[in-house]
């Protein structure tokens, strides 16, 4: 009888061993595949960061969970950029969709940057730290490498018939990198990278970021908000197919040249106004990280 019981257990033991081996094999395969996907994505991101010129259009949305995107707030960005031996030159503005109301406007080139004091319609110039890798905000996701420590999952997919990668961030990284209110709690976050090719070079043509955040109001009530950030890149031309260098030159000549002051002069004016009791309002400063992202400072 004991022999029969032992024999009856053997198939079950064998089955358990087979299942364990299969699970381990799948986990190893999944880990290797994820590593390969991450390498492919980072190669495309590196190629994007090396693009010589182009433009970008970005749209940001913030709305309550379960509501329509149009029910919340939104912002539209437009950027053009050109890389040279000494660094990147770019112009980027943000505001409403038709550009009639701007919340920020920047023109940055190696060694200096200009920002628009929107209250006074006055451009302000200041020195830019040499070697600082500043990029348009609209390009930050497409040109920032992804680490395995940031992600919970990566998989390959297609969007509108184009190859793409979806990266799902892990909660620990979301919590440590979130730059919102201290009472906010990021729940989930992901980015879809849509790829394009230029000859043999694969680069990121579009990014779609989504972040779900639990927010707490002054009364202690909690709700979930959804933040979406969609950025489309145009390689080599402006949005309307024009020459990037010419567009940058024209923008500077028409908007900034002869219409800016030094930031040191602005600080002097501010000090004087403060001492005299006047109320002074200064627009967004180019020293804020919202200018763009760098290897040292991420805007997101």
Q: Residues of each region from the PLM?
A:
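Short, exposed beta-strand/loop patches in secreted or surface proteins that constitute
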Residues: 47, 78-83, 105-107, 149-158, ...
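Short, hydrophobic/aromatic-rich segments at coil-to-beta transitions
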Residues: 51-57, 85-91, 160-168, 203-206
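An acidic-aromatic
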Residues: 75-139, 212-214
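Short consensus segments that form the blades of beta-propeller domains
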Residues: 69-71, 104, 180-185
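N-terminal leader/targeting segments and the immediate start of mature chains
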Residues: 2-84, 243-296, 300
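A structural detector for beta-sheet-dominated domains
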Residues: 57-63, 91-93, 109, 126, ...
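Gly/Pro-enriched, hydrophobic low-complexity segments
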Residues: 96-98, 160-270
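Flexible, processing/modification-adjacent segments and terminal tails
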Residues: 34-37, 111-183
